[in-house]
């Protein structure tokens, strides 16, 4: 694969020893294959976003060394660019959920080698109002759990893995009414959680949605109704299988556009970041960004 000049963005909040180890694993590999590698370290929350917004035409690839939060910032900047560089994800976070969908090795050195020897594929990006996400958007239980944890728990578990851990112990959740317009068809629902997905993993757990794909131009919409959460727990622990067994408790549909309204504004979780709320309009931007993937994907 031919690359001229790349930008490598890495999370500066990972601790000095961790940063040195991570850079030591990937920089020699990238430097061997690239004419030039510019390394930028994030220090403040929005740095990754601003680094990507200011990319010039000479940069043809952006490598993101970090977790799902850093990737989320970069994708929000790159998705709005007229000329978009290719993106390579180097999994350096707690969950690294989207990298799992792409089949990227979770070992950093192996990931760098696989991407350099790999190929490009065009993936869908989802747009929510004026923001973008790669993996998922959710309201209800997932947003409430992510928003309530303290900094120590975040550091130990990561926001989304904390959700999956809490899901194993929480006995019930309050349901809420919502009105959905799915590709123009309006339905009213009562649910404990609504997930709108592009990826297939949450907190390293694969959700076995039968038709999920990151290049089909469709959202995967999961409505979770059962307040005792048994069905949701079972679904997230299944390696494979059919969602049909949860009829009545869970509903799964695909759509290119969904509008969500709730009686009162509900906080929304996008790729592990809780900073938006309902109402929301979500649509797919088909094959919007080129990503590097291993050759066998």
Curated annotation (Swiss-Prot):
GO BP annotations, alphabetical order: phospholipid biosynthetic process
Active site positions: 273 (proton acceptor)
Protein name: Putative lipid kinase BmrU
Co-factor requirement: Mg(2+)
InterPro entries in UniProt: ATP-NAD_kinase_N, Diacylglycerol/lipid_kinase, Diacylglycerol_kinase_cat_dom, Lipid_Phosphate_FormReg, NAD/diacylglycerol_kinase_sf, YegS/DAGK_C
Family: Belongs to the diacylglycerol/lipid kinase family.
Enzyme class: transferase
One example GO MF annotation: ATP-dependent diacylglycerol kinase activity
EC numbers: 2.7.1.-
Cofactor binding note of this UniProt entry: Binds 1 Mg(2+) ion per subunit. This ion appears to have a structural role and is required for catalytic activity.
Pfam families: DAGK_cat (PF00781), YegS_C (PF19279)
Residues that hold ATP according to the record: 42, 67-73, 94
Binding site for Mg(2+): 213, 216, 218
Domain called DAGKc: residue spans: 1-132
Function (record text): May catalyze the ATP-dependent phosphorylation of lipids other than diacylglycerol (DAG). In fact, is not able to exhibit diacylglycerol kinase activity in vitro.
UniProt keyword annotations, A-Z: ATP-binding, Kinase, Lipid biosynthesis, Lipid metabolism, Magnesium, Metal-binding, Nucleotide-binding, Phospholipid biosynthesis, Phospholipid metabolism, Transferase
């Amino acid at each position: 694969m031919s690359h001229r000049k790349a930008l490598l963005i890495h999370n500066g909040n990972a601790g000095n020893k961790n940063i040195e180890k991570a850079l030591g694993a990937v920089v020699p590999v990238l430097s061997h294959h690239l004419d030039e590698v510019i390394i930028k370290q994030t220090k403040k929350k929005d740095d990754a976003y601003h680094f990507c917004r200011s990319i010039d035409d000479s940069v043809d690839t952006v490598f993101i060394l970090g977790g799902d939060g850093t990737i989320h910032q970069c994708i929000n900047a790159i998705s709005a660019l007229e000329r978009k560089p290719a993106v390579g994800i180097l999994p350096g976070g707690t969950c690294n959920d989207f990298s799992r969908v792409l089949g990227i090795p979770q070992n950093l050195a192996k990931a760098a080698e696989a991407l350099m020897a790999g190929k490009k594929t065009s993936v869908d990006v989802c747009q929510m109002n004026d923001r973008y996400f790669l993996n998922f958007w959710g309201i209800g239980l997932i947003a409430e759990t992510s928003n309530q944890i303290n900094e120590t728990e975040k550091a130990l578990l990561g926001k989304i893995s904390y959700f999956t851990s809490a899901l194993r112990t929480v006995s019930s959740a309050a349901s809420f009414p919502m009105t959905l317009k799915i590709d123009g068809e309006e339905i009213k629902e009562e649910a404990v959680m609504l997930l709108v997905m592009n990826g297939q993993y949450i907190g390293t757990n694969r959700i076995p949605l039968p038709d999920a794909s990151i290049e089909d131009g469709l959202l995967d919409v999961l409505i979770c109704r059962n307040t005792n959460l048994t069905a949701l727990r079972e679904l997230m622990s299944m390696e494979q299988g059919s969602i049909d067994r949860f009829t009545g408790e869970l509903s799964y549909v695909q759509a290119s556009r969904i509008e969500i309204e709730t009686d009162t504004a509900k906080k929304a979780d996008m790729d592990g970041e809780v900073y938006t709320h309902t109402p929301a309009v979500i649509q797919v931007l088909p094959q919007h960004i080129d990503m590097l993937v291993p050759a066998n994907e």
